[in-house]
């Protein structure tokens, strides 16, 4: 049975709906990125789904289509701010900023996951990137944005292979930390003792 990715957009069809997703909650290095997307119900782009279920090439193509055809915004919270306020609060802050930065004010904000927000417009949907087209589109924009940021940082610190692992705790990344220590972009709040 195929899931209707517009089920939530249809449920709230009388409202301006934005979908939000984040990229970068789990990595050892780099920022967390949240993106918000307001889809145009008269111009549905085919092929949009959870960014993790798409090839890199397909994600790139859809990113270009989404950012060319829909209203969108992105918010980036640095690794240092993550260390100051914790990853959950940093993610929530990024989501709130992404919604606020849209050029149109959403009346309903669909957010992937189970985070709770004080703003009553925010509706958290577990596995939302598999259930809402808006959230799936936002997942693509967030992932591509963060991957590009990590690619840029990788030129400064190639030994951590961020161009390949995006800062996640892969075996090679952990070996690089053991060999070279932490870079200025590593999250100091992460418990590295389990790796080293």
From Swiss-Prot:
Residue ranges of the TM segments: none
GO MF term set: manganese ion binding; RNA binding; RNA-DNA hybrid ribonuclease activity
Cellular component, GO annotation: cytoplasm; ribonuclease H2 complex
Domain of life of the organism encoding this protein: Bacteria
Predominant location category: cytoplasm
Localisation per UniProt entry: Cytoplasm
CDD domains tied to this protein: RNase_HII_bacteria_HII_like
Binding site for a divalent metal cation: 21-22, 112
Alphabetical list of SUPFAM superfamilies matching this protein: Ribonuclease H-like
Disulfide pairings: none
UniProt remark on cofactor binding: Manganese or magnesium. Binds 1 divalent metal ion per monomer in the absence of substrate. May bind a second metal ion after substrate binding.
Residues covered by the RNase H type-2 domain: 15-196
Pfam family, one: RNase_HII
Keywords of the record: Cytoplasm, Endonuclease, Hydrolase, Manganese, Metal-binding, Nuclease
Cofactors (names): Mn(2+); Mg(2+)
One Gene Ontology biological process: DNA replication, removal of RNA primer
This enzyme's EC code(s): 3.1.26.4
Catalytic activity: Endonucleolytic cleavage to 5'-phosphomonoester
Record family assignment: Belongs to the RNase HII family.
General function of this protein: Endonuclease that specifically degrades the RNA of RNA-DNA hybrids.
HAMAP family: RNase_HII_B (MF_00052_B)
Entry protein name: Ribonuclease HII
Annotated source species: Rickettsia canadensis (strain McKiel)
